[in-house]
Regions:
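Pyridoxal 5′-phosphate
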Residues: 1-192
Length: 192
């Protein structure tokens, strides 16, 4: 979910079975994303939602479904979201991953340099290759930190970040995550 907005991803080079990303993480609308799956795996999977346009035939006791990906697309699609996601992808491609990756590196290095000057901060990924820095502040619950940042109009994320096994490995219930993107500046990091 985090890689696609920040770097080129080729599912064939990765030879991944599945890859997912959210539209909102790459300047697109919320409520839409992409799920790539190898065709043979998608063929083996059963749909979990049912509705119009995904059915080939229906009998009283059984149904047959269209070929993937259509068998997973029920009812009316989120047309506006799809148009918005397409525009976001075009925008990212226009800006270019070379610029995005250079900006991520510049901002990440600066953020890490400045955070290391502050006593009481534990950085869990000091050698990150992305613009995402995960940390905690001694004596401050991550959700309390998030509340204070929010009151100062600084958007960060606190919680287990959909990675509870990692939190157990870190022996933490939650962490704070700060992310940069190509539109951020050093001034944003100074404010953070």
């Amino acid at each position: 979910a985090q890689a696609v907005p920040h770097m080129p991803v080729d599912v064939k080079d990765l030879d991944c079975d599945f890859l997912a990303f959210s539209g909102h993480k790459m300047c697109g609308p919320t409520g839409i994303g992409v799920l790539y799956g190898k065709h043979h795996l998608l063929e083996e999977m059963e749909p979990v939602e049912f509705g119009g346009d995904m059915i080939e035939t229906v009998e009283l006791e059984c149904a047959t479904y269209k070929e993937p990906p259509y068998k997973f697309e029920t009812g009316t699609p989120i047309i506006g979201g799809a148009i918005g996601l397409g525009a976001a992808i075009d925008y990212i491609n226009k800006i270019g991953y070379d610029f995005i990756m250079k900006q991520d590196q510049l901002l990440r290095d600066y953020m890490l340099q400045e955070m290391k000057k502050i006593p009481g901060i534990t950085i869990y990924n000091p050698k990150t290759d992305t613009g995402i820095v995960t940390f905690n502040i001694d004596g401050v619950h991550p959700h309390d930190a998030a509340t204070v940042f929010d009151q100062e109009n600084v958007a960060i994320r606190a919680g287990h970040h959909c990675a509870q096994p990692l939190m157990r490995c870190l022996n933490q219930v939650a962490t704070v995550r700060a992310s940069t993107y190509f539109y951020n500046t050093k001034e944003d990091i100074d404010r953070f």
